[in-house]
Amino acid sequence: MEEAYRQARKRGEQGRRRAISQSEYPYLTDLDSLVAQLPLGQRENVGLRDIPLEMVVGTVTKGRQSAFSCNFMPLLPFGTEFARKWSNLYDIQVTEGYRDPIIVTEFMHRFYVQEGNKRVSVLKFLDAPTVSAKVTRLYPGTWDSVESRLYGEFCAFWRVCPLYEIEFSREGSYETLAKMLGQNLIEKWPQKKVDYLRHTFLLFKRAYLCAGGDHLDITPADAMLVYLNVYNQDRLLDTPTDIVVNRLCKIWRELVIAGKNDEDKVDLVEAPSVDEEKAPAKSTSGVLNFFMGKTVYSAANPLRIAFIHEFPCATSSWDSLHDQGRQYLDEHFGGIVRTEAFEDCHDPDVFYAAVETAVKHGANVIFSTSHRLMEYTLRAAVEYPRVRFLNCSIGLPHQSVRSYFGKMYEAKFLLGALAASMADNHRIGYHASVFASGALSEINAFAIGASLLDPRAQVILTWGDVPAGGLAEAMCREGVSVMTGADMSKSLEDPTAYGLHRLVDGKVTGIAMPVWNWGRYYELIVRSLLHGTWDETSDDNQVRAVNYWYGMSSGVIDIRYAPGLPYQTRKLVQLLRNGIVEGSINPFGGELHSQNGVVQIEGFPPLPSTQIVEMNWLADNVVGTIPQLDDEPKVPAL
């Protein structure tokens, strides 16, 4: 008894000194002082609950603050009445256990003790995981901060799945977790599902701490979401801890990125290096090796690249264009680069089989050409760390997979201006089939371009797939004479259902279309590999995701006019295009207005690129709404 108290007091002194050395408060926090200047909401009697002891962080009042260190260990000398009572409670706990619950107030996902401070101290000394408590929840008075919104999401989660242990630091994570488990935040979860999540989380947390996760700036629940995005959760309970630890080590950089602020997660590479722009084009011998720097490839030792397409190239124009880019590499680099393609890999098993085959064939680089393949690509990249993986997407913060996409908003800005110059009634249609990263910047750039030519222009926004031949019907229904569809036809059977069109006498006629030059894009990326500048793009000491985001100035994006377009119109659009390429025109510079008000005032510089990628608003001349994201696909294990 005496020895236990002396050890506990020693821990208390250590905790107190450590807090002082780190300029932190060395005693227990009291809730009364914490909320004295804060607006508070209602109280709710939650009832009798088992709560995690690690979340018990202070007292309700100041009364016993100085008797405990900030780690809840005792500070008063042995021989005091306090020490005697603490020791008696210790004896009861180790011989028969406590019968009565403590009384606590919950505030912002932390607990403050009203009755039972010494019992909490004893249990923490014994490393007990939980304590029985009568809980009263105190709600904040406002919900306008990130912390309060996160707590609101936790409360919604807790009502359907009463687990205190699950704590996230990113908004939206509770909903993501619910979707992964086939649940939602509205209907109460079956008890079996609650128990399953509790056991799964505790198993994962144990492995996470064994791997050194307590040194990261994320919670164990944050880390579990990252893990489940890569590895299947169905067998997690049956997976030995050492295997989970090994997997965590493989995705460690993904965990590090998860702990960064959004603005620090991604490096946007917006232009190729000078070497990539001006590199020698083609060689079939070792002459080019002189120029290769760190990375040496030749016809005898080629750079092998695999392309994995979501659908067959014969039926998908998107995949067909990417495959044309692949073929361009074979021709352009004359044997120094050799490629192979895998089509119709939207099924995860087919995708992973394609990766395995490509690796067996000696692939150094693997491109997956759809953003919907990113999760499969991430899983494969973790399994094959020596292979470089890239996915055609933007704004996704994965260190193991580089992303690449084009500044399509630049082309849409030009198409918007062109549309306004030809619309009869100030109404212009915009049909978007997919809500993905970058989609809103394209819509807004189109709307801003239209407003430059016609301040009264309205952009009528619709979403979803359009059946073959359905564009004209959609235009009539919306009362518009000019409309832009998808960047390209989803099916080669309907080649007119994309780009900017005009409805004349019931017939759809093309005006212009955006153009992807994937051959040029792949050439620039491959040059970075051939010249050894790939690794110079990112700093190994700063773990960040790398996203290539090239535009018109790099030659990867352009527009193509339909025959017969008036030369005056072409001249106007060409002037705007030159401004985009030279950098003197940016659709997101200066005064900007959204449907909800002013985004920025006149004279402001263009929005930062990260804000353009992550745009979450619609321009004030857009008539439409932002849809809710569909459920993300689950990624089966390899």
Name every feature range the model reports, one short phrase each.
Residues 1-118, 124-125, 170-183, 190, ...:
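Short, charged/polar connector segments at secondary-structure boundaries
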Residues 382-405:
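Flexible loop/hinge segments that line or gate small-molecule binding clefts
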Residues 362-371, 390-392, 480-489, 508-516, ...:
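Periplasmic-binding protein-like
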Residues 305-324, 329, 342-348, 436-440:
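Extracytoplasmic "Venus flytrap"
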Residues 107-108, 114-177:
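Glycine- and acidic-residue-rich phosphate-binding/metal-coordinating active-site segment common to enzymes
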Residues 404-426, 515-536:
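Hydrophobic alpha-helical segments within soluble ligand-binding/sensing domains
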Residues 326, 414-457, 540-563:
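An alpha-beta-alpha
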Residues 531-537, 541-638:
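Segments of small-molecule ligand-sensing domains
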